[in-house]
Amino acid sequence: MENMNLEKWLRSLDLTNVEKKVVKINTSRRLPAVILVDTSGSMRDYEELLQNSVEELYAAISRDRAACNATELAVLSFNSDITILEKLREIKQHEAQGRNLRFHCDGMTLTGLALKKTIEQLEGRKSVYMNSVPRIKNYAPIIFFISDGKPECYDEATQKLEDEAMQYCKEYIRREVGQNRLIVISVEVGDFCDHNLMRELTGLRDDKHVMKVDNATELANFFKITSSIIISSSKTGSHNLNEVDFSKSR
């Protein structure tokens, strides 16, 4: 019954705000990667660091020709609203290469709805791959999820939507990770995250994909690790990442 409900939920997703274009002369197998960043009020001290780190991430990937051809990147931020800063598409098609992205930290933490928007980007883009002629192959997508707290909402109507989204996102992640069709790496910033939730959102039963950062230096280093993961996976695939322990990486 859970799978039937999940499939119904997936069919209800809004895929209208998904990049439909592909560069057909690019025959590389695609690696979809999403950076999902909590920009609630408590992340305010990291605004400039996030901006600079994302620019450096773009630069690192773009310097590697093979990775640049294979990587498709999306950047989303979330607080009381969910913002698609960059749709999931070939990184070469991001004209500003991250220089236009701004992280304004304020408001609440709608984690479930943010994950739903992330899944819409992934599912929509996979549909584009499937319907392209010739069909575009892809590696398992990677979600890099960064937060310093836990879901927070004070509006009753929004809370209902948040709870529903969180329920289905957990089911989706658990299923896709279990079938090795998705990788989620959670990053706890500081000491106030809901650790059990951050682990659950990796789809794994242990802490292998939960990273902990305590300061700006460690958060900046996480983005360097992220670029290394993306560059490597764009060449050799992401299929083995769910076996890799990232919990001690800083």
Predicted features, each with a name:
Residues N26-K87, A96-Y139, I142-I146, I183-N196:
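Von Willebrand factor
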Residues L182-R250:
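Von Willebrand factor A/integrin I-like adhesion domains
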Residues A66, R89, S132-R135, P141, ...:
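P-loop NTP-binding core
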Residues M1-V34, S40-E48, K126-Y139:
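Acidic, polar low-complexity linker/tail segments
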Residues V54-S62, K116-V128, A165-I173:
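Short, well-ordered amphipathic alpha-helices
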Residues G149-L204:
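VWA/integrin I-like adhesion module and closely mimicked acidic/polar interface patches used
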Residues A70-L101, H195-G203:
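Short beta-strand-loop
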